[in-house]
Amino acid sequence: GILLLQEKLQTILGIQKLIIVPGNSSDNELVLKEMGKITSSIIINMLQSKDIIGITGGSTMAAVASEMCKSEKPHDVMVIPARGGLGSELETQANSIAAVIGNKLGGRYRLLNVPDTLEKDALEIIVKNNEIKESIDLIKNINILIFGIGRADAMAIRRKLPKERINSLMEAGSVAEAFGHYFD
């Protein structure tokens, strides 16, 4: 069953530990909550002093933040968005999720107040801002990265890609997206 599949995937992907939560999180809110609960438990168990935790946005990462228990003792950690913001739902923004997790862990958090989709010229100007530069320096030193993998079609729409690009991705067999990269 699932344990055998977990072991196979661990071997194929070269991953030390992999957990499969049965069900379809798109159809069942309880599956998403369980994913959040398991992920937050793993994070808490692996934390060490001075960790820099990067987290992306999305419904799964919001579930991780929601299901994380408030720590009884503060952790000397920094939580930071691993990417800029995307879309308009506050609850699923990486900034919001980083703040919730940072507070629940009794640690610190930083915000990254830039959109996820910026033209190169605009990005070059924005990264000169000291606050943003400090956040980017922290991102470069993340030692725990927590990210979701989204459906390619849904993420292409959220990223407001041109219809031609979306069609091209779908024709190429794209099924998943992470960090703006699409996978078949």
Give short role names for the model-derived ranges.
Residues 66-70:
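Distinct, well-ordered alpha-helical segments
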Residues 1-4:
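N-terminal helix-turn-helix DNA-binding module of bacterial transcription factors
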Residues 7-49, 73-156, 160-162, 166-173:
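Ligand-binding beta-strand-loop-alpha-helix segment within the catalytic cores
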Residues 53-63, 86-87, 152-153:
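Gly/Ser/Thr-rich loops at beta-strand to alpha-helix junctions
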Residues 169-184:
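Glycine-rich phosphate/nucleotide-binding loop
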Residues 23-25, 51-57, 180-184:
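Acidic/glycine-enriched edge-of-secondary-structure segments
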